[in-house]
Amino acid sequence: MSFLLLGATLASLGPSWANPAQNAVVTKSVANVYSSPSEDADVVSQAIFGTNVVPLEERDDWVKVRTPDEYTGWMPLAALRRLGPGGRLYAAAGRVAQVESLTANLYREPDVTKHQPLLTVPFETRLEVTAEPADHEGRWLQVLLPDDHPAWIQRGDVTFDTKPLTIKQTIELAERFLGVTYLWGGTSSFGYDCSGFTQMLVRRRGVTMPRDADAQAAWKGLAPVKRNKPKPGDLLFFGSSPDHISHSGMYIGRGKFIHDTPHGHPGVQISRLADQPWARLLVACRRLK
């Protein structure tokens, strides 16, 4: 689907991206972030549609970027559009809708029957709203995409209320993702990995924490808690030792926690802390300060 490139051609990208004073925006539904400039490299993270990133280095058809959570890695040029020096960040001001459905379709017209969706975007995608017509029973919003093309989204798929969630609301949100597939390096509702899922839950509480589980456990924004006294909303960290953390989840009460795991039936699931291997591997418990 040529629309997925959203007008991002090499000719339009300019001679160099290696300028941290500039910004770029993701134009794919979800763009992989690689450990090195090759699709054969490990996928270490992702960035969703409309995410603003900072280009750090250019190499052939690749750009090293820094994402909003300070993660760095390599993305293909074709997944980005450069905003230019002093360019306006996408969906950073004005009337902005955020996708609240697990996924949402974008259309070229306010009609689901005439055309296939232009694009399917994940949970938390932010979109610039340009019109809220009263016709169509108020069901549709017109949005401006990062390539300056218009599109339409159904109002029921988005929210304008993005205030931080309570612990109870965060747990209710987490349970909406039960069964969503596990994806190594994933940070979207198309597939999370363990730390991508817990990072999203904490983000919805209004806090941006590091991307990886070991960095999360060491982060100063979390306070240590006794492992045998967790409270709902606390983060749990698992590994072979406190210095080798490889998994994370969120405690939801009554001896249970929710997490995204590749084990058993891979995906978001609820497990009991008393069960193995979790009881043996639990090495740290943390609480937002």
Language model feature labels by segment:
Residues 112-114, 159, 223-227, 246, ...:
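Aromatic- and glycine-rich peptidoglycan recognition patches
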Residues 16-22, 28, 38, 51-54, ...:
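Boundary regions of SH3-family modules and the immediately adjacent low-complexity/disordered segments
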Residues 182-196, 200-232:
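Catalytic cysteine-centered active-site loop
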Residues 23-33, 93-107, 202-217, 252:
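Short, basic/aromatic beta-hairpin or loop at an interaction surface
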Residues 1-12:
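Bacterial N-terminal signal peptides
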Residues 37-42, 106-116, 218-225:
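Short alpha-helix capping/helix-loop boundary micro-motifs
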Residues 50, 122-127, 233:
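Loop/turn positions that initiate beta-strands
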